[in-house]
UniProtKB/Swiss-Prot annotation:
Gene3D superfamilies: 1.10.10.410, GatB domain, N-terminal subdomain. It comes from Burkholderia mallei (strain ATCC 23344). One of its GO terms (biological process) is glutaminyl-tRNAGln biosynthesis via transamidation. It catalyses: L-glutamyl-tRNA(Gln) + L-glutamine + ATP + H2O = L-glutaminyl-tRNA(Gln) + L-glutamate + ADP + phosphate + H(+); L-aspartyl-tRNA(Asn) + L-glutamine + ATP + H2O = L-asparaginyl-tRNA(Asn) + L-glutamate + ADP + phosphate + 2 H(+). This is Aspartyl/glutamyl-tRNA(Asn/Gln) amidotransferase subunit B. InterPro entries: Asn/Gln-tRNA_amidoTrfase_suB/E, Asn/Gln-tRNA_Trfase_suB/E_cat, Asn/Gln_amidotransferase, Asn/Gln_tRNA_amidoTrase-B-like, GatB, GatB_C_1, GatB_Yqey_C_2, Gln-tRNA_amidoTrfase_suB_CS. Coiled coil: none annotated. It comes from the Bacteria. One of its GO terms (molecular function) is asparaginyl-tRNA synthase (glutamine-hydrolyzing) activity. PANTHER family: GLUTAMYL-TRNA GLN AMIDOTRANSFERASE SUBUNIT B MITOCHONDRIAL AND PROKARYOTIC PET112-RELATED (PTHR11659), GLUTAMYL-TRNA(GLN) AMIDOTRANSFERASE SUBUNIT B, MITOCHONDRIAL (PTHR11659:SF0). It holds the Pfam family GatB_Yqey. Allows the formation of correctly charged Asn-tRNA(Asn) or Gln-tRNA(Gln) through the transamidation of misacylated Asp-tRNA(Asn) or Glu-tRNA(Gln) in organisms which lack either or both of asparaginyl-tRNA or glutaminyl-tRNA synthetases. The reaction takes place in the presence of glutamine and ATP through an activated phospho-Asp-tRNA(Asn) or phospho-Glu-tRNA(Gln).
């Protein structure tokens, strides 16, 4: 039986976070009434000329620097010629032979797949290019009595099309890359990453070939995948479709396909065009884009600390593991919250802060379906909770209750933890005399567990600890309870 290798390359369209469009002053705001944000340039009215948006160029430069790419000192805009109702000019302004960003790479972390028996691993994906272009408008096929409505609000919206080499070998790798890229463009502040609004969407080029064969198989391109789940499902379906087709004696046709999320399958959209079909030529209305070293240096000086650099700093500065550092820098907001938390709680509590952020805080965020920047418990409020754990005022169990209380009541005061501790009498019992008296009562009431422990059953000790904690309503210092029990049991 033939063993097949999957070959995947991704083309990602990231909408750049400029206020105005790439070649006009019209707004890029999402959700406006149809055709209310389309100026004469976007409508391709006679006599208008495009003017390049400097902010879009600077965002492209920022991306190129972040991935270690070459920022072209001179790049050229080209006309990509095709007819479609939502493309008023009859061509799209893009870049072809000389893109603004050339090369670069992104390192991805592919998670373990226990069902397939695969461990987690890292991989570097090389990028071919990233180029600037304008978006087209939108065709609306519903509510028009069999006709099509055209909304040109998106026409001219600035995009950075980011193209990888065909180096990914599974849907899992493609999703890991897409997530890494998604996180990076948001970290850099060049794209809001809103997939529901179309700000970040992927086209997947998928082919299969026998293992060991160097020549690529015929590829199909799956267009406009706007969620990570759709990306994974579409690739997996397409791989199965192509393998079954070849093994049944058929041939894969080079074509563009769409993914149907309801049926969880891809379907043919049109035959795939090659570059020559678009008749690219330099746009005579736009001068070549010249980017000097001083411009690049200025943009570099304004860039935030990159995730990889911050990860290494977290490991060295706070003593967290490489895995923890990766989670803590998964988004810029998460990293900023962690640093604010440690600044308030103290560097000595950095590991405790990391554990809480990845554990209880993330759990509550997932429960409520919100991101860290919408967390109702501020870094200062959580820091006080951690300080009270560290100084022995409360146990970790009580701390969790206090955290949930602050979360649910959306308390505004930084000293919420101390207020709740006093109001509910939650201070940990650390008085040795008081604890000894309680433990004596527990031992007297649980003679059977005492006998079992002395007979060598360790589980009996845990049962006694549990009874002691129950007797103190969770307020006892667990470490002291353990020590006193061991002392009394000999």
């Amino acid at each position: 039986m033939t063993q097949w290798e999957v070959v995947i390359g991704l083309e990602t369209h990231a909408q750049l976070s400029t206020v105005s469009k790439i070649f006009s002053g019209a707004s890029t705001q999402f959700g406006a009434q149809p055709n209310t944000q389309a100026c004469p340039v976007d409508l391709a009215l006679p006599g208008v000329l495009p003017v390049l948006n400097r902010g879009a160029v600077e965002r492209a430069i920022r991306f190129g620097l972040a991935i270690g790419a070459t920022v072209a000192p001179r790049s050229v805009f080209a006309r990509k010629n095709y007819f479609y109702p939502d493309l008023p000019k009859g061509y799209q302004i893009s870049q072809y032979e000389i893109p603004v960003v050339q090369g670069g790479q992104i390192t991805i972390q592919v998670p373990a797949n226990e069902k397939a028996g695969k461990q987690a691993y890292s991989k570097t994906v090389n990028l071919t290019r990233a180029h600037l272009e304008e978006d087209a408008g939108k065709s609306l096929h519903e509510d028009f009595a069999g006709m099509t409505g055209i909304d040109l609000n998106r026409a001219g919206t600035p995009l950075l099309e980011i193209v990888t080499e065909p180096e990914m070998r599974s849907a899992a790798e493609a999703v890991a890359y897409a997530k890494a890229l998604h996180g990076l463009v948001m970290w850099l502040g060049i794209c809001d990453g809103n997939m529901q609004e179309g700000s970040f969407r992927c086209d997947a080029n998928v082919s299969v070939r026998p293992v060991g064969q160097e020549k690529f198989g015929t590829r199909a391109e799956i267009k406009n995948l706007n969620s990570f789940r759709f990306l994974e499902d579409a690739i997996n379906y397409e791989v199965r479709r192509q393998i079954e087709l070849i093994e049944d004696g058929g041939e894969v046709v080079q074509e563009t396909r769409l993914y149907d999320p309801d049926k969880r399958e891809t379907r043919s959209m049109r035959s795939k065009e090659d570059a020559h079909d678009y008749r690219y030529f330099p746009d005579p209305d736009l001068m070549p884009l010249v980017i000097g070293a001083d411009w690049i240096a200025r943009v570099k000086g304004e860039m935030p600390e990159l995730p990889a650099v911050m990860q290494q700093r977290f490991i060295e500065q706070y003593g967290v593991s490489a895995y923890d550092a990766g989670v803590l820098t998964s988004t810029k907001a998460m990293a900023e919250y962690f640093e604010a938390l440690v600044a308030k709680a103290g560097a000595a509590n950095a590991k405790l802060a990391a554990n809480w952020l990845m554990g209880d805080v993330s759990s509550q965020l997932n429960r409520d379906g919100i991101d860290i920047d919408a967390c109702p418990v501020s870094a200062a409020q959580l820091a006080l909770v951690l300080q009270r754990i560290a100084d022995g005022t409360i146990s970790n169990k009580i701390a969790k209750e206090i955290f949930v209380t602050i979360w649910d009541e959306k308390a505004a005061d930084e000293g919420a933890a101390d207020r709740i501790i006093e109001a509910k009498g939650l201070k940990q019992i650390s008085d040795t005399g008081a604890l000894e008296a309680i433990i004596d009562e527990v031992l007297a009431a649980n003679a059977k567990s005492v006998e079992e422990f002395r007979a060598g059953k360790d589980k009996a000790f845990n049962a006694l600890v549990g009874q002691a904690m129950k007797a103190t309503k969770g307020k006892a210092n667990p470490q002291q309870v353990n020590e006193l029990l061991k002392k009394k049991l000999g």
